[in-house]
A protein has these predicted regions:
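Bacterial N-terminal signal peptides that target proteins for export
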Residues: 4-19
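Bacterial N-terminal signal peptides
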Residues: 16-28
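The substrate-binding groove and active-site-proximal loops of carbohydrate-active enzymes
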Residues: 45-55, 79-94, 141-160, 182-189, ...
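Conserved, mostly hydrophobic/aromatic
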Residues: 47, 66, 74, 103, ...
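Short, acidic/polar
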Residues: 53-68, 159-165, 280-291, 349-357, ...
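Aromatic-lined substrate-binding rim segments of carbohydrate-active enzymes
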Residues: 60-67, 72-140, 164-167, 261-269, ...
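Polysaccharide-binding and catalytic clefts of secreted carbohydrate-active enzymes
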Residues: 136-297, 301-314
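Carbohydrate-binding surfaces of carbohydrate-active enzymes
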Residues: 271, 281, 292, 303-712
């Protein structure tokens, strides 16, 4: 019997080997002979990897350390043009092909970056016209990045050829998930060619000089133009219509610059490969909605810089990015510890990088990628945080990222197909932010901070916020808030009026609808085309040297930086707040008014309220709008994020209280008295236990990932 068993075991071993060989032969092979990739994880941990900076003999050691840390994606190539095309027309992508294949052997996917952010020396030497000209008329030189002219035809031609070569090589590689075009669009050129193209853009937009002169009111200061080539480029201070037109031209030019490469990539790659570019949060150098139109995926670079994670500030940036495409996004770069470009480059606290990662995911990130993997031995960013030191051994942060990788692998299947959604939207407009920045009227007025001042209390109550443009579809929101929507186009005005008439609640903040779409003053008092619906208007605005007292429905508090004297013109308008004794003009006058319009409502808040006032205002507007929290009451400092879809609802809870007393903790009955199924025992949270039992102090010490049982 023993012999038979041995024979049977030998037979089974031979059969298993034969089956494996047959399966191996039948599996499709990708370029370079590697096995075709399986479907990528729903939640990816990644890093920026620069194989061109290191000998090929070191690659696998790096990739092995990535694999051990749970890194499943690398971004490569975005600064390697000189290696890929060492001289004009002589392309060398073999080394990059080998790097992609080496990553694949470790089960690591790749995002390929086109290298146009850093042109090679031969290019800028041979074609100096491809270098940008700054506002002072100085031409950039080689030795940095982003020194190219984004409007130059020759540069676009060479960048397109490079992108085409890359797409032909990697467009059908199943281990390549997608493409990043360029890197962090930012610097523009003020050369003669760009100026001429701007003038042609104006001609296409306005048609005639008479129309342009009328809409810009160029009779002011004798600015009238008699020829298109008389129109200058102005930034910062100048005719408001000209300034806004220049920024719109810049946005369109970045879009066409991007499309120049995007077209050849799309023509040569599989439809499953996405195309993105890495944006920079609240950076206002161009209109991100315009640039995002042609992309498959929005992504951004999440850097805290100096200081520490502010959950509301960072969360708003995630929600802004999610709004560029109206769906989940990627964090293409984030800091592993510290940066190198602030006045004080403090490192993030232990646990803070992990807290950031889960915070990203809660707000809709499907990938979190660290910049960068290993310190370069030289270069401008030697001091920037990395996962490996220059010696090639793990930095102290490596183990924390490894923990994130393990958690992502565990939670990914549950988060698959889920995304945030909200009953509350905040409207955001680049036109409006630019317009206010050019004419602040109070040097301390920051339009981004105005948005955050509304976002912070609203997010705490609703536990989910969308940030969208004023032209977005608004029908699914119970509450829409428009802080500082200074420039209001006819299209946006029509959209907002329709939203209110269909039963929504629109809340406007100060400075709303002062300007038309040419950045000129509206012919009606604020809020311009929305005044009739409001049944009231702004009689006068005041930049504030001191705070002013405000009292009413939102309690007693202060108005800061800006206050507007409101008046009610319709009998059914309710005054919510009034000013106290201040400058005489505002004394006793309405500071906030509201009006029911059929099943809808429209509200105007004319003062930038202090924190307590904003919190009370947020509570009032959410209650009267019927907004429900995504999850339910939680202790102070606990942030809830909800992702819907897939097989149900997934909640992510993090404790940001970070106080000496341990901050918040949920009781035995759980937060909001709820018990649901824990997805993972992350940081001591018990599987199947109450939410966050306990939520310890520290940077997201115990991020709780939970499934709503009702949805499964």
């Amino acid at each position: 019997m023993g012999i038979i068993v041995r024979e049977m075991r030998g037979w089974w071993k031979s059969l298993r080997l034969a089956v494996l060989l047959v399966v191996g032969l039948l599996l499709p092979l990708g370029p370079g002979g590697q096995t075709a990739a399986p479907a990528p994880p729903a939640l990816l941990l990644g890093t920026a990897w620069y194989p061109e900076q290191w000998p090929a003999s070191r690659w696998d050691a790096d990739l092995a350390l990535m694999q051990q840390a749970g890194v499943r994606m690398v971004r490569v190539g975005e600064f390697a043009w000189s290696r890929m095309e060492p001289s004009e027309g002589q392309y060398d992508l073999d080394w990059l092909d080998r790097a992609v294949a080496a990553a694949a052997k470790r089960g690591i996917y790749t995002v390929v970056g086109t290298p146009s952010a850093a042109p090679p020396a031969w290019l800028t030497q041979k074609y100096p016209e491809t270098l940008l000209i700054d506002e002072k008329g100085l031409r950039a030189e080689h030795g940095n990045r982003q020194q190219f002219n984004f409007d130059n035809p020759k540069y676009r031609e060479l960048a397109r050829k490079m992108a085409e070569q890359m797409a032909k090589r990697f467009g059908h590689n199943s281990w390549v998930l997608g493409w990043q075009i360029d890197n962090e669009y930012s610097d523009v050129s003020f050369d003669a060619g760009t100026k001429a193209d701007f003038q042609q853009w104006l001609k296409a937009r306005y048609g005639t000089l008479d129309n342009l002169n009328a809409r810009w009111t160029t009779a002011y200061w004798s600015e009238t133009y008699f020829d298109w080539n008389q129109i200058p480029i102005q930034t910062g201070y100048g005719n408001p219509g000209l300034l806004l037109s220049w920024m719109r031209f810049v946005s369109d030019t970045w879009r066409s610059y991007q499309k120049n490469q995007l077209e050849v990539i799309r023509a040569n790659c599989d439809s499953r490969q996405f195309i993105t570019t890495n944006m920079m949060g609240w950076f206002a150098g161009y209109d991100h909605y315009t640039v995002a139109k042609d992309l498959d995926l929005a992504s951004w670079d999440d850097y805290i810089g100096q200081g520490h994670l502010d959950a509301a500030e960072n969360g708003a940036t995630h929600d802004l990015t999610r709004g560029f495409k109206g769906k989940n996004f990627w964090v293409m770069e984030t800091q592993p510890g510290a940066v190198n470009w602030q006045k004080i480059n403090n490192s993030l606290d232990k646990g803070e990088v992990r807290a950031m990662a889960w915070h990203d995911v809660g707000h809709g990130a499907d990938a979190v990628s660290y910049w960068q993997w290993r310190s370069a031995l030289n270069g401008q960013e030697e001091y920037h945080g990395t996962l490996l030191g220059a010696d090639g051994t793990p930095a102290p942060l490596y183990d924390e990222v490894k923990q994130v990788g393990a958690e992502f692998a565990k939670a990914g299947p549950v988060l698959a197909g889920t995304s945030p959604k909200s009953e509350v939207a905040i409207l955001h407009s680049y036109d409006s932010r630019w317009a206010i920045d050019w004419q602040k009227h109070n040097a301390n007025y920051d339009p981004k901070e105005e948005i955050i001042s509304y976002y912070r209390p609203l997010r705490a109550i609703a536990q989910s916020i969308d940030i969208v443009p004023a032209t977005a579809a608004l029908g699914g929101y119970k509450l829409v808030v428009a802080p500082g929507l200074n420039v209001l186009s006819d299209e946006a005005a029509k959209n907002l009026i329709e939203y209110v008439r269909n039963g929504g609640h629109l809340v406007m903040g100060q400075r709303t609808a002062m300007k038309n779409e040419d950045n000129g003053l509206q012919t009606e008092r604020q809020p311009g085309p929305l005044a009739d619906l409001l049944g009231g208007r702004v009689e006068q605005y005041y930049a504030l040297l001191e705070t002013v007292p405000v009292q009413g429905k939102f309690g007693a508090g202060k108005g800061r930086l800006w206050a507007e004297l409101l008046s009610a013109k319709a009998a059914d308008v309710e005054v919510l707040e009034r000013y106290g004794k201040s400058n005489g003009w505002l004394d006793g006058q309405p500071a906030a008014i509201t009006r029911a319009v059929g099943k809808g409502r429209i509200t105007y808040i004319g003062a930038w309220l202090d924190d307590a006032g904003m919190k009370a205002a947020a509570a009032w507007m959410t209650e009267i709008s019927g907004v429900r929290p995504a999850f339910g009451p939680v202790p102070y400092g606990v942030e809830v994020s909800a992702r819907y879809g897939g097989r149900g609802t997934v909640y992510i809870l993090e404790n940001f209280a970070n106080g000496a007393d341990g901050g918040a903790a949920c009781g035995d009955d759980g937060c909001a008295g709820r018990r649901d199924e824990a997805v993972g025992d992350f940081g001591g949270i018990r599987r199947g236990g109450a939410f966050g039992s306990p939520l310890r102090a520290g940077w997201g010490a115990n991020p709780g990932i939970y499934k709503d049982r009702r949805g499964f």
